[in-house]
Curated annotation (Swiss-Prot):
Belongs to the conotoxin K superfamily. Negative results: does not affect (up to 50 uM) the Nav1.7/SCN9A channel, Drosophila Shaker channel and rat KCa1.1/KCNMA1 channel expressed in HEK293 cell, as well as on whole cell current of neurons from neonatal rat hippocampus and prefrontal cortex. In addition, no detectable effect is observed on either action potential amplitude and duration or Na(+) and Ca(2+) current amplitude and kinetics when im23a is tested on action potentials and depolarization-activated Na(+) and Ca(2+) currents in rat DRG neurons. Gene3D superfamilies: 1.10.10.2920. The cysteine framework is XXIII (C-C-C-CC-C). Neurotoxin that induces excitatory symptoms in mice following intracranial administration. No symptoms are observed after intraperitoneal and intravenous (tail vein) injections. GO terms for cellular component: extracellular region. This is Conotoxin im23a. Disulfide bonds join 34-41, 45-55, 56-71. It is found in: Secreted.
Length: 72
């Protein structure tokens, strides 16, 4: 539960910074777990025990492409 709250807060901070700079992709690549692909971000997100839908939305929010076989 604490991990989810921490991750949510972290994502909000990153997305706020990304909105301010106008470049979410650049900001997302500064997050160590995102790597270079949407699949890497999705994989990391799932390992945090977050829902499939939440992870799909997260990857899309940072302007990366989630894995097509996992996200509709």
């Amino acid at each position: 539960m604490i991990m989810r709250m921490t991750l949510t807060l972290f994502v909000l901070v990153v997305m706020t910074a990304a909105s301010a700079s106008g470049d979410a992709l650049t900001e997302a690549k500064r997050i160590p777990y995102c790597g270079q692909t949407g699949a890497e971000c999705y994989s990391w997100c799932i390992k945090q025990d977050l829902s499939k839908d939440w992870c799909c939305d997260f990857v899309k929010d940072i302007r990366m492409n989630p894995p097509a076989d996992k996200c509709p």
